[in-house]
Amino acid sequence: MKMHKLACIVVCILTTFLSAKAADQFISFSKQEGTVALFQNNKAVEIKVDQNDHPGVLRAVKSLIADIKEVTGCSGQIGQNENARIIIGSLDKSSTIQQLAKKKIIDIKELKGKTEKFIITTVGDQLIIAGSDKRGTTYGIYELSRQLGISPWHWWADVPAVKHNEVYALSGTYTDGEPVVRYRGIFLNDEAPCLSGWVAEKFPDSECPSANPNLAHGFNHNFYEKVFELLLRLKANYLWPAMWGNAFYADDPMNSVVADEMGIIMGTSHHEPMARNHQEWARHREENGAWDYATNQKVIDDFFHEGIRRAKNNEDLITIGMRGDGDAAMGGKEGHDDEFVSQDDYYIKLYEKIFKNQRQIIKEETGKPAEKRPQMWAIYKEVQHYYDLGLKVPEDVLIMLCDDNWGNIRRVPGASPEGMASFDKKLVERKGGWGMYYHVDYVGAPRNSKWANVTPIAHLWEQMMLSYRYGIDRLWILNVGDLKPMEYPIDLFLSMAWNPEQFASSDSFREHTLAFCESAFGKDHSKQTARLMELYSTYNGRVTPEMLNPRTYNLANGEFLQVVNEYKALEADAIREYNSIGAEYRDAFHQLLLFPIQSMANMYELIYAQAMNQFCYINGMAEANEWADVVDVCFDRDQQLTDGYHSINGGKWNHLMDQTHIGYFMWQQPPTNIKPQTNRLTADQIRDGGFILSSKVGYVSIEAEHYYSKTNAKDAQWNVIPTYGRTKSAVALMPYTAATEGASVNYKFELPKDVKSVKVHVITNSTLPYLRANGHRYAVSIDGGTPVEVNYNGDCTEENTYHTFDVVATRIIETITELSSIANTETHTVTITPIDGGMVLEKIVIDYGGYEKQHLFGTESSLKNENPNEWPMPQRAFPRRNQ
């Protein structure tokens, strides 16, 4: 464009210098006052971008042109015309953007010295997208695509493009600012058989000349280009590549080249140090020798040298430290991370030696001091033991803390045996910063979790906000398994990583779910589909399908049937929605909602039928044979549902639901799905009468949000977290970083007058002792009596986690306290007082003699209102299907 033409548009230039707004909607599909027409009447559009801009930016522009064509029908082309309708460029590379800044047409202060920031502004009849660097510009390009109607999941979940004949840009300057979390990414892990089978079929090495056909097996740069683009559209920048049977760097040398070109920072997992993939060692283990730094240092150092030499010119974040061979603890057997035997002094000294030598290698290979090259040390599994004993790394190294593989944060910066009254971020700040490695997929004890998304939305939000509030804001990475079917957790996780403050309120994640569903399924269906997504993640979070068995839920009192019916109702709603939604949305709906709901509903019916078969068989009931038939039908239907998923969009996603999930008898997956065992009765075995039925009372079950009264702390308030936990919701004192002094919550209920003592079951989220290593505490009392202090997670150590309660993966801790100082009245009050932060209260059960163990801790007792004329309470506290 001619600069004097732009300079004369005084009003437009002045508006540019107004404070840039967060990237709200800057695209309109109808003409308004002050709007700029971008696309109309199928007219071709030229986009001006300097050819010497970053290659990744040029790639993104080509994607934008394709997006424009799909939305509007308008063709686009890259050119150098000064009057081009759209101008795109990076401040550090584009002479056009530099000239615009020099002429004060764009405000250089918005970009100079910024990281991954873009601004989008209108000047005259042109739209300008300018970025501070290659990722900033790319994010700006894809933000335009998103607002045009191209979901980041357009390719990866077949979300349709929204068609528009006319597109206008609103006047003003828009931005999303800089990201809060510097490294934001995912880990493709546990990728066999699903992802590995899919990539081998869809990205054959025969169509990728740079790939080694004997090694890559589809994990080549043709595949990774799709992953990189998804990450960039989600404003992510970091990836740990698939590594079970593959070596990202070695199997296709173009993998790392394309990653760097597109702007993706590569890393390696917690047991793959110095930019080397495990397979690069495992394939040559015979000639390499033992993966033992104490006995094989020279060979391992040479191995490390090669990794840094290969990665030194890229942005790779270097993992340092070392674990055992194949995700094992130091000294353990390959793949056996459960066989950890501590030798504290020996391994701490060995780690210190490893750190020192690795940093020397980095210095030698890069020609720069080690502190100039970003590095990360993962405090994963047994490594936390040494960290707690005082093992340290240099100040410039990023320390990545981890969850327990099941979505519960293990430790936060500044944690100590006695914890802290309140958190001061300044006390834990370090140059390298803090990171978090979080799981929505896992392989290991007590069972793998690979088949389904079982992470409740509320739980992911709560734990990542916990991380952020404790200063973990340098790196967030999510273990996503095969990527599908974890689309929504990925989206939420990465959205939070960009700006956690936008998710500060305890219902913010619901707004995100609604926006995601509006993008995926259209505004008319957004509320109903968001409800489906919310409920299925909540239901799935109760227990993983791999751990579901006939004894998980109480069969005798109807709890198991209640849960089965909840899933059936949800499935019915999903089918109705599928039939009513537009045909163009159905492929996306099938992947994101219909299959996850139907497959899990069928799984519950399968295991319920097995439980009923066992019960009826033992009691000689003829129905045993009918329930055995149901098991057969459900088992066959599981495969039918899988086949249906694999046929979506002409078989685009074939193999991605190949994961076995029925028939676990140990932590590792069965080689094939195994039909649950059933028994059948012959005619002479069928019992003739003699059944006795009973009704039991003797407990009060209370949802945590139904408190009688509450008292906030000075700097913290009780918050209700909707959909959290196994049934309805949870309450938590937030922010966790503030002191809890003065806070309490009271629950009022009625008991028979002859009750002398009760057992109070307090059900909390399985919060690990991340802050106070000796355990987090609360106090409980009844009717103003002496409070009893309860340490509810002090024995949740790495060594005995799975023995402490059913399994940590159930995300529940149940503590039982017997109280006898009961007033001689009909109405009573239990008071719960948090002593340490981080307590997430889900349910309270008052047992006065009739409670039997239940997975959902009983249906909530009838609610009684003291002023029934003002507010008549429903008998059922939470009619979930009608919400």
Where are each of the predicted segments found?
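The substrate-binding groove and active-site-proximal loops of carbohydrate-active enzymes
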Residues: 128-131, 192-195, 199-220, 237-246, ...
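An acidic-aromatic substrate-binding cleft motif
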Residues: 153-210, 216, 222-242, 432-435, ...
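Contiguous, structured surface segment used for ligand recognition
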Residues: 22-178
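Structured mid-domain segments that build the active-site/substrate or prosthetic-cofactor binding neighborhood
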Residues: 232, 237-240, 246-247, 403-407, ...
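C-terminal non-catalytic alpha-helical accessory regions
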Residues: 159, 163-164, 511-660, 745
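Gly/Pro-rich turn-and-neighbor structural signature
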Residues: 167, 243-244, 250-261, 288-431, ...
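Bacterial Sec-dependent N-terminal signal peptides
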Residues: 1-25
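Extracytoplasmic
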Residues: 666-883
